[in-house]
Amino acid sequence: MRIDRYISKSRVIDIESTDFESAVSELLSVCDVTKERGITKKGLLADLLDREKQMTTYLGNGVCLPHARIKMKRPYMVAVGRCPKGLVYDGQPEYEGIRFIFLLLASKNARNYLFSLASLARVFQDNGHMDRLRAAIKITDFRKELKQVFAGEENKPRRRHNRFNNLILREAAKIAKGAQCTSVLV
């Protein structure tokens, strides 16, 4: 899944807060969730913090991935924050190691929610990708690296079969059939 499609430059920020709750609140402030009916920033923050108390979203490698399913029109919304000094939350020491918070908001109708979480987790496990993100000093460089890291291999242009390619393939198949070949190498 191409997560980079859901990352907007305006939702990639440097977090100024030092505690987890305020950091998530900063990320929510750059998300346009107030346009959706029945969703308040305060209620969404409470849901995210409740989920965090039940089970941590800290994945290791300096990454925290709070996520929630909400009623919204778009399938996904991703906000990313850098925390160079780590965060404080309920006295838990692992939060001090957090350097990135990826907030994933998914529509209740989104089909590939678990697949999206898995795609994000795969990137976070790759030390090469994480080193590229850590190496970006300016926020503009970080945004660029973020897009490249999440675009992955799918960022390469796809090869399309055009009429000419199809014509050559059909003619090659005819020649191969006439020569009693069992396969065609193009």
Name these PLM-found stretches.
Residues M1-V186:
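Cytosolic covalent-transfer regions centered on His/Cys nucleophiles
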